[in-house]
Amino acid sequence: MARSVWKGPFVDGYLLNKADASRASGRSEVIKIWSRRSTILPQFVGLTFGVYNGHKFLPVQVSENMVGHKFGEFSPTRTFTGHSSDKKAKRG
């Protein structure tokens, strides 16, 4: 179920502070975040975030198309190694 419109988007407070500090400094450094549940806001466009996937921080360059989505959508947590092949079918 979607979040109620009257509540507004969810963003962790520390994330807003880090984004504002990064914009003020003018440096294009990666902002490390653990909050995969936070919504991407328009003020984050152009910034690079390192989103933690449980193993390492994956760099995510925020574009206008990402606004309204969650950070976790752009940092996959699982690696698909493929299905095992059927040995009987290969022998043919």
Swiss-Prot record:
One of its GO terms (biological process) is ribosomal small subunit assembly. InterPro entries: Ribosomal_uS19, Ribosomal_uS19_bac-type, Ribosomal_uS19_CS, Ribosomal_uS19_SF. The keyword Ribonucleoprotein applies. One of its GO terms (molecular function) is rRNA binding. Keywords: Ribonucleoprotein, Ribosomal protein, RNA-binding, rRNA-binding. Transmembrane segments: none annotated. One of its GO terms (cellular component) is cytoplasm. Belongs to the universal ribosomal protein uS19 family. Protein S19 forms a complex with S13 that binds strongly to the 16S ribosomal RNA. This is Small ribosomal subunit protein uS19. The lineage of its organism: Bacteria, Pseudomonadati, Pseudomonadota, Alphaproteobacteria, Acetobacterales.
